[in-house]
Amino acid sequence: MSISGDVDPAFWAGKRVFLTGHTGFKGSWLSLWLQKMGAHVTGFALTPPTTPSLFEEARVVGGMTSIIGDIRDREVLERALLAADPEIVIHMAAQPLVRASYDDPVGTYATNVMGTVHLLEAVRKACGVRAACVVTTDKCYENREWAWGYREDEAMGGYDPYSNSKGCAELVTSAYRRSFFGGASKAAIASARAGNVIGGGDWAADRLIPDILRAVEKGEPVLIRNPLAIRPWQHVLEPLSGYLTLCQALWHDPAVAADAWNFGPRDEDAQPVQWIVERMCEAWGDSAGWTRDESVQPHEAHYLKLDISKARAGLHWRPRWSLGTALESIVVWHRAWRAGDDMHDYCHSELERFAGARFVHAA
């Protein structure tokens, strides 16, 4: 069967999906998307990491089974996964912040590395799982500050504990795939590496877009640590569409799909932080501006891009929204939230705008 780059609602209708990290920013968006397509979703995660949170503001819990638990607790995770009896597993639970990893390196490694081991061990015992996607990050690569994008076969590395732990998670996933998941009767295992994800509903600390929104709401200049740092920015729905497409491919053609995959933006959307800040301030209006934070900062990479040629050719996946469109959507989303709009309905409308004609309401 040929692999299509489209997310197929008919495929997901009725599928049993186990999703870790469902209370986070990306996990909440993915939970809503899966619910809208008629999947039976069981989520496993810690309580929402921020107040406010997208999970609560969009009433994500209403359409799924939500289990509050810690992936560092192997027995609890295993019981939850086996009880859910999933056909598809998507592993997104993580300690996701570079700066937080400097404060708690032990917790970061325990969550991002051993949490992945615990998840894959549970999948080994779950007879009904046919596809599993382990989500890591673009920062898993050994960053050499190259001007070109990293490909999936580049060396794993990572300067800081977060990035390094995600490189380790990639190595764990590769070892488990080769050691335990070969053969037609086994689950097909893949890993997915996404760029810097942005979108409405992100209130995390020490992340660019939430920091910008917090500052402009207060009428204060945005403090920017590294204005010339270049990242592969993408709207949150872009990589999520990649994960869903990858799971479909794992189901239909595991020999091709059981591998590592990059999901990033077009080359022209790898922009410096200053470019993002200036356009967000312009879109917000009200004389919003920025200034450089001159305090001493921990190390962060200056230049990072992803090569998505493999996903284009092998999965027929492609980015849909430009960076400009993504930034505009964030400002509109945030203004709607501030105005008291129903964010559950608004998020569903956002999903339809992103998916366009491909999106079909589940019966």
Where are these regions (language model features)?
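NAD(P)-dependent short-chain dehydrogenase/reductase
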Residues: 144-149, 153, 161-162, 167-254, ...
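Generic structural signal for alpha-helix termini and adjacent loop/cap motifs
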Residues: 104, 122, 126, 179, ...
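Amphipathic terminal alpha-helices
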Residues: 1-11, 323-363
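N-terminal Rossmann-like NAD(P)+-binding domain of SDR-like oxidoreductases, especially those catalyzing
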Residues: 1-194, 354, 363
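Glycine-rich loop motifs involved in handling phospho/adenylate chemistry
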Residues: 22, 228-232, 296-300
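Conserved C-terminal active-site "lid" loop/helix of NAD(P)H-dependent oxidoreductases
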Residues: 236, 259-260, 296-317, 339
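C-terminal "lid/loop" region of Rossmann-like NAD(P)-dependent oxidoreductases
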Residues: 258-262, 271-277, 282-303, 345-351
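Residues in well-ordered alpha-helical elements
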Residues: 74-75, 87, 99, 106, ...
